From Swiss-Prot:
Top-level taxon: Bacteria
SMART domains from the UniProt entry: Ribosomal_L2, Ribosomal_L2_C
Keyword check for RNA-binding: yes
PROSITE patterns for the chain: RIBOSOMAL_L2
Family according to the record: Belongs to the universal ribosomal protein uL2 family.
PANTHER family: LARGE RIBOSOMAL SUBUNIT PROTEIN UL2M, RIBOSOMAL PROTEIN L2
Protein name as catalogued: Large ribosomal subunit protein uL2
Function of the molecule: One of the primary rRNA binding proteins. Required for association of the 30S and 50S subunits to form the 70S ribosome, for tRNA binding and peptide bond formation. It has been suggested to have peptidyltransferase activity; this is somewhat controversial. Makes several contacts with the 16S rRNA in the 70S ribosome.
GO MF, one example: structural constituent of ribosome
C-alpha cells in the first residue's frame, strides 16, 4: 500500500492524496453476493429530510458481508482476493470455503490472496481467524466484535479499527477500545483476530468538493451564514459569531454535549471514553 501525492496539474488535483493498493481486485464483485442499493436522498417515507448532507453520488451495489461466521466453524477457507467496497472504509476479502461456498468478510490487516483462514474454538491464534472471546488470549488485538452472541460484529469494523482484550473474569471479558473506553462483553461473543485493513484511509485527501459529491455527500452550510428563520445562529448585521454557545439547527447543544442515553448498558462500561 502506497501514499501518492498528486502533482498540481489542475486546481482539483493540487491537494489530492491517494492511497494505492495494488493487491485490490480490479474486476467486478462476486455477483451472487451483491444486492441492489437504493438511494433515499436523506428523505423518509413522507419525503422530508431526516438526514442532512445526503444526496446524489455514484450508483452502488451492496456487498453482502458475513459478520457472524458462526455457521462455518471448522471449515477452512482460502482468501481468493481482496476487494474495494464503496459501502465502508475497510476493504473486504472474498473467501472460498472447502465446501465450495463463497462469502465476503471484512479484510483483516496483513491478510492477502491465498491465505488460509478458519473459524471456531480450535482455530489457531492468527490474524483473520474467528473465535469466541473466551478462547482468545489476554492481550490480543481483535476486531469485528459482537455485543450479543450470534448477532454479528458491531464493534471495530471500520478501516484500521481494533480493540484489545485486557482481562477475563467469569462470563465476561474486558476490552479496551480505540476511543479509550473500557467495557465488558460476554465471553460467548465472537471476534476476529488482528486489526481491520486499510489503516491508511485517514491519510487520504479528496482534494475537491466534487470528489465528496461522487460519494453522495452534499455541502454543510454554517449556521451563521443562514437567516434567523433557518438556524439559531442566523441573522445579524454583517458577519457575526452566532452570539451563543454552538447549537444544532433545532437548538440542542453541539460540539461536546453528551448524547449517550442507553442507561440499560451503563453497567457494562468500566471506564468512559476519553
Amino acid at each position: 500500500m502506497a501514499i501518492v501525492k498528486c502533482k498540481p496539474t489542475s486546481p482539483g488535483r493540487r491537494f489530492v492524496v491517494k492511497v494505492v493498493n495494488k493487491e485490490l481486485h480490479k474486476g467486478a464483485p462476486h455477483a451472487p453476493l451483491i444486492e441492489k442499493k437504493s438511494k433515499s436522498g436523506g428523505r423518509n417515507n413522507n419525503g422530508r429530510i431526516t438526514t442532512r448532507h445526503v444526496g446524489g453520488g455514484h450508483k452502488q451495489h451492496y456487498r453482502l458481508v458475513d459478520f457472524r461466521r458462526n455457521d462455518k466453524d471448522g471449515i477452512p477457507a482460502t482468501v481468493e482476493r481482496i476487494e474495494y467496497d464503496p459501502n465502508r472504509t475497510a476493504h473486504i476479502a472474498l473467501l472460498c470455503y472447502a465446501d465450495g461456498e463463497r462469502r465476503y468478510i471484512i479484510a483483516p490487516k496483513g491478510v492477502s490472496a491465498g491465505d488460509q483462514l478458519i473459524a471456531g474454538a480450535l482455530a489457531p491464534i492468527k490474524a483473520g481467524n474467528s473465535l469466541q472471546l473466551r478462547n482468545i488470549p489476554v492481550g490480543s488485538t481483535i476486531h469485528g466484535i459482537e455485543l450479543k452472541p450470534g448477532k454479528g460484529a458491531q464493534i471495530a469494523r471500520s478501516a484500521g479499527a481494533s480493540a484489545q482484550l485486557i482481562a477475563r473474569e467469569g462470563v465476561y471479558v474486558t476490552l479496551r477500545l480505540r476511543s479509550g473506553e473500557m467495557r465488558k462483553v460476554l465471553a460467548e461473543c465472537r471476534a476476529t483476530l488482528g486489526e481491520v485493513s486499510n489503516s491508511e484511509h485517514s491519510l487520504r485527501s479528496l482534494g475537491k468538493a466534487g470528489a465528496k459529491r461522487w460519494r453522495g455527500v452534499r455541502p454543510t452550510v454554517r449556521g451563521v451564514a443562514m437567516n434567523p428563520v433557518d438556524h439559531p445562529h442566523g441573522g445579524g448585521e454583517g458577519r457575526t459569531s452566532g452570539g451563543r454557545h454552538p447549537v444544532s439547527p433545532w437548538g440542542f447543544p453541539t460540539k461536546g454535549a453528551k448524547t449517550r442515553g442507553n442507561k440499560r448498558t451503563d453497567n457494562m462500561i468500566v471506564r468512559r471514553r476519553k
